[in-house]
A protein has these predicted regions:
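Short, solvent-exposed recognition patches
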Residues: 14, 18-84, 92-93
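A short, solvent-exposed beta-edge/loop patch
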Residues: 69-133
Length: 133
C-alpha cells in the first residue's frame, strides 16, 4: 500500500529524494495513512476505503468543496484534481487517495519541481501500483 517499503522506494525514485522518516501507518475510520518526512517539509498520503460508488463520489466531491480545485483535467484513476494548495486527490473504484503536499516547500525534489507536480508524480506512482489502475 502507500506506506509499504515498495511504495517508499518507488516514491523516492520518482521524487529523487529520500525521506528522513516514513511514519508508522495508521488505520482510522477506514483511512490508511502515513507521513513522508524530509529535512525541509513533509507530505501525507492517505487512502479512504468506501463501500460503493455513491459514497466514494461524495467523499471525493467533499475534498473538492473543502480544498478547492485548480483548473485542468488530470488523467488518473476514475477522476482526479489538484487542490488550490497543490495537493492531489484521486478517485479509483471505492477508494480516494489524498496526496497532501501543503507542508512541502513550493519547490521540492531533485531536481526541484512545483509541489503540485511533486504531488502528481506521487499520485501517478501510487496509482501505477494499484491493481487495475
Amino acid at each position: 500500500m502507500v506506506c509499504a517499503p515498495e511504495a517508499q522506494r518507488e516514491i523516492t525514485a520518482t521524487l529523487g529524494i529520500t525521506p528522513t522518516l516514513v511514519t508508522v501507518p495508521t488505520w482510522t475510520d477506514h483511512v490508511y495513512s502515513c507521513t513522508y518526512q524530509y529535512p525541509d517539509g513533509s507530505f501525507v498520503l492517505s487512502v479512504k476505503e468506501l463501500d460503493n460508488v455513491k459514497e466514494t463520489v461524495a467523499y471525493y466531491d467533499g475534498y473538492r468543496a473543502r480544498l478547492g480545485e485548480r483548473p485542468g483535467p488530470i488523467a488518473l484513476g476514475n477522476g482526479a484534481f489538484v487542490t488550490t494548495d497543490g495537493s492531489v486527490v484521486v478517485r479509483k473504484d471505492f477508494k480516494v487517495l489524498l496526496v497532501d503536499t501543503s507542508h512541502l516547500p513550493l519547490r521540492f525534489g531533485a531536481p526541484p519541481q512545483d509541489r503540485s507536480d511533486a504531488g502528481l508524480s506521487v499520485a501517478a506512482t501510487v496509482m501505477s501500483c494499484w491493481t487495475g489502475a
